[in-house]
Amino acid sequence: MEKLQGFTDHVMLYVKTLVKWLLSAALIGTVGGAVGSLFHLGVEYATELRTEVPALLYALPLAGVLIVALYRFLRTQGVGTNAVLDAVHQGRELPILLIPAIFLATLLTHLAGGSAGREGAALQIGGDLGEHFGKMLRMDDKDCRLATLCGMSALFSALFGTPLAAVFFALEVVSIGVRYYSGLSPCITSSLVAYAVSLRFGIEPMRFAVAAPETGALTLARAAVLALGCALVSILFCEMLHRTEHLTERLVKNDYLRAFLGGCLVIALTLLAGCRDYNGAGGHVIAAALGGTAKPEAFLLKIVFTAVTLGCGFKGGEIVPTLFVGSTFGCAAGALLGLPAGFAAALGITGLFCGMTNCPITSLLISVELFGADGLLCYAVVCAVSYVCSGYRGLYSSQTILYSKLRAEFINVHTK
């Protein structure tokens, strides 16, 4: 009888925990989906307005000054995606005012033509929302960390329209090698709910029709070579992002002046480039590359534009610029390797995303959700090669890699 009672108590504990998280995660997903959808629509409107009024580019220096003033006014200076990862790692508290700060700053960056994405900002908004919902629901420190992951999944899912990749990105990006699988069911719930909410807002998920060639040994070998190139480009991109930020902070101590000069530099670069392809997120360039058309120098120019924009204090994200760089590099390199240009662009996106984020499972899932499963083996090969060959560099310095990429060894290092 005692054994039966113990078994019953054991089962009820798991059922209660599951129900608690299903309800909590659904709440986070509902709010996160709504906020993420509004954020998506805001960035979309800012992009359309900038396209209709090209002269807004010349307001970029002023936008930079306003962003610095906004962050100082809300006392959120120095708080970014790394702080969200630290909140999961160490339970550090996130300021609630980070949400309006990154929301408005990203809109200003896109409105005036800074080269940035939105998913990095979404991770900050989602992580902050999740953590504060956890506190509102009187969760303890450990559960608040899972709530933070739920928020990250929800916002990523709402913006990207890739609910499975959103789940594993939140679980995978914090600590490479060990995943918080206790957060699997909560993150799936919040991600699916947020995705459903985004559809109700009329947000169309990112999907591309990419034809995959027949998978054979030669195709896989070509994909592996392309993945090696993606790994090298990801190292270059990460180095440019980090070194540009450190260099500008050292050369120009005043935050306002740094943002102002950064805006002026982006204007100068735009005039030199002779087009607006490298301002904003560049979604049309990604679509063109996946259609088989890209300038061979486009990936290098996007790296420079993004490094200057984010390094000088503008806000947004690095994920969509990563897709831009990956698609244009893949499209250009595919012609040299004998791969179909559009398919090579898809492989480039997969390889760059993996190399920049150190998240191979997420990269594989995102490729399937964006492009379909026809080229699954090629995407898997690209993820494997890019993950190993990109070394220990990454977008987020608070990301930890617990196990060596080269051997079965515990190393516990931060990305460079």
Question: Where do the model's predicted regions map?
Answer:
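Alpha-helical transmembrane segments and immediately membrane-proximal extracytoplasmic
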Residues: M1-K416
